[in-house]
């Protein structure tokens, strides 16, 4: 018999030692996110979490999301520290619009070759997002898959579970004629529209690291982490009769606002109530993007829109602004049988 070389998993491109090193690196930041309801620690086959005792009829709310091609821009610019915040934000913001308090979060990180420093930066960002939203990072999957991704490219996905009192679910059914719409300012494009962002960068020939906008590199505007609205919105829900909340993500104004409107209602948005942050003006000009397309692709400075009764507006604005939000009245709800569910005028 001829001698054969003994192959290992590492020879095939999977470094178990690197995976173990990553777990050791992130344990500290993950521990900081722990809620009292979580049982056990990292390393189990599954994560255990009790329901908070304050709920009489708890309803679980779940969501999953990614960060789209904002990830490609982050990889190109070698900036991995905030993409994890984006990942958490996209999930927990979708939960809180239904009145849910996020409980726990899990992540999926896949790459062709595991770079411990990069993965650690991403997961540290995820932990920071969990801290900002008050949920526990209870586990995840790090998949090193040679041949599936180019070099050290990676992809991430997030999964979140929250809880809401059954009688306090926010589903838009209470929205009615005369309700007022309040906007919550965004931190930038958040995590949507980045295929168009990257196309605009390509066509314009712009280097986002050297192009200045409002006194800082364009890259800082484009990679600003998605704002997490959980804590301020939960405080609002405790004090104010909120009828509906829309998270402005993919599809922008035209597609997200109708998701929370009952039949025979229309949202009328007052375009003069705010000014677009400069990054959106730059994108529109550099890409020669039509106004309708801007509102379909980007949040244009508005991360969430909240519908509530007119008598609650002043109280809501004061509470939101006191909790660090940039909130303003952006429009109203009108009774209408028009097929156009959103009007911007």
Swiss-Prot record:
One of its GO terms (molecular function) is phosphoribosylamine-glycine ligase activity. Pathway: Purine metabolism; IMP biosynthesis via de novo pathway; 5-amino-1-(5-phospho-D-ribosyl)imidazole from N(2)-formyl-N(1)-(5-phospho-D-ribosyl)glycinamide: step 2/2. It is found in: Cytoplasm. It comes from the Bacteria. It catalyses: 2-formamido-N(1)-(5-O-phospho-beta-D-ribosyl)acetamidine + ATP = 5-amino-1-(5-phospho-beta-D-ribosyl)imidazole + ADP + phosphate + H(+). InterPro entries: PurM-like_C_dom, PurM-like_C_sf, PurM-like_N, PurM-like_N_sf, PurM_cligase. GO terms for cellular component: cytosol. Keywords: ATP-binding, Cytoplasm, Ligase, Nucleotide-binding, Purine biosynthesis. GO terms for biological process: 'de novo' IMP biosynthetic process; adenine biosynthetic process. Its EC number is 6.3.3.1. It is an enzyme of class 6 (ligase). NCBIfam families: purM. Belongs to the AIR synthase family. This is Phosphoribosylformylglycinamidine cyclo-ligase.
